[in-house]
A protein has these predicted regions:
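Canonical positions in the second alpha-helix
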Residues: 64-65, 98-99
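Bacterial Sec signal peptide processing site at the extreme N-terminus
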Residues: 16-40
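Helix-start (N-cap) detector for alpha-helical repeat units in TPR-like alpha-solenoids
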Residues: 39, 73-74, 107-108
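Canonical tetratricopeptide repeat
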Residues: 78, 112-113
Length: 126
């Protein structure tokens, strides 16, 4: 009796193990972090877009730089500055918080968070 159940359950258990192996996630590819020169050039290009007044393209460029360089605070603080200057205080605070995750002592990000919060509070009272 036990032997027949074991014979029936063994192929089923094997099939479940095979299916579980198929459902597992593939091994993640190693993230390629750009060199310091590529990072500096990308930042300079985004800065040029911002200086030319093309803030939307600059923010997109900074966000791409942030994705490519996840430990760097600079692109996030640049996005925060642009959002703050445009009066998008909530977005500026979010970007400043991203900066502070990477550089807890960044004064620019702390200022944007504090002043942006105050300006949002004033708006809510108007």
């Amino acid at each position: 009796m036990i032997s027949s159940r074991l014979k029936t359950l063994t192929p089923l258990a094997f099939a479940l193990m095979v299916l579980a192996g198929c459902a597992s996630k593939p091994v993640a590819e190693e993230v390629q972090v750009p060199s310091a020169e590529v990072y500096a050039k990308s930042l300079a290009d985004a800065d040029a877009l911002s200086a030319a007044g093309n803030q939307e393209a600059a923010v997109s460029a900074y966000r791409k730089i942030a994705i490519d360089n996840p430990t760097k605070p600079d692109p996030w603080v640049k996005v925060a500055q642009i959002d703050f200057a445009q009066g998008h205080y909530s977005q500026a605070i979010v970007s400043a918080e991203e900066t502070l995750k990477r550089d807890p002592s960044n004064r620019q990000a702390k200022s944007i968070t504090a002043v942006g919060g105050l300006r949002l509070a004033v708006r809510s009272l108007e």
